[in-house]
Regions:
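Structured, solvent-exposed acidic/aromatic patches
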Residues: 1-233
Length: 233
């Protein structure tokens, strides 16, 4: 049952994003093998998702209390740490309850309170963050790392660089790598590193050109390594 509970949380993690992006989806009748599957209203889906999350938390909580590991070799998110799964599920429950507050305020309040007042609670610190990364037997790598570092086909945009540099945002060095030392158009930022981004709509595709004045190959990369998790929350 605990593996099914994890699967339930994973399902809701993905489907609530689809719901928020596109509106009504097939949920209550999905997976039953029918050819014609009716779409549920957003209100119905949120209500059912909250119910399913509550059920998953109920199953996992005793395992968390007893420090039982679940699928630790194959869990790419929390390495089998059920306590963190419960925190994530409760945080997801709180998020969905907030989405529902204007339509079903009492039900939203009920689930929000249930999530926050749960004995294990919600995510409260950076170590609780949910993100898929390499596991003991699965060598998952961040796809953006391959695109930016191996294919040299992604660079930081000027929009975010202008914001981070303009406001002297301390997250600059956490988000962006300095430009290559050969880049002649890089700009010195407040942290004394030089950065350069690609303008929106830029059509220069010569990523491997050797001209440092006319190729984004030398521009700032997103600061991502192969083992950087793909964060969900």
């Amino acid at each position: 049952p605990e593996i099914a509970a994890l699967a339930q949380i994973l399902k809701i993690s993905g489907w609530h994003k689809v719901l928020e992006s596109f509106g009504p989806i097939p949920y209550t009748a999905a997976g039953k093998g029918a050819i014609d599957v009716p779409f549920d209203s957003e209100e119905t889906v949120y209500t059912e998702m909250l119910k399913d999350l509550a059920g998953a938390v109920e199953v996992l909580t005793p395992k968390a209390v007893n420090n039982v590991k679940v699928m630790s070799d194959y869990d790419l998110v929390f390495n089998g740490d059920v306590t963190k799964w419960v925190k994530y599920a409760n945080s997801l429950m709180l998020r969905l309850a907030i989405r529902l507050r204007s339509v079903k305020p009492e039900l939203a309040k009920q689930y929000a309170k249930q999530a926050v007042e749960h004995s294990i609670g919600v995510m409260t610190e950076a170590g609780d963050a949910a993100g898929a990364g390499p596991g003991p037997v699965i060598a998952l790598r961040n796809p953006l790392y391959w695109i930016a570092d191996n294919y040299n086909d992604a660079r930081v945009g000027t929009s975010i660089l202008a914001y981070l540099m303009g406001y002297k945002d301390p997250r600059l060095s956490a988000y962006c790598e300095p430009a290559n030392s050969q880049c002649t158009v890089a700009v010195t930022a407040f942290d004394n590193n030089k950065y350069q981004g690609v303008p929106l709509g830029h059509t220069n595709t010569r990523s491997k050109d050797t001209d440092p004045t006319d190729s984004y190959y030398f521009y700032s990369k997103p600061k991502i390594q192969g083992n950087t998790p793909l964060y969900w929350m």
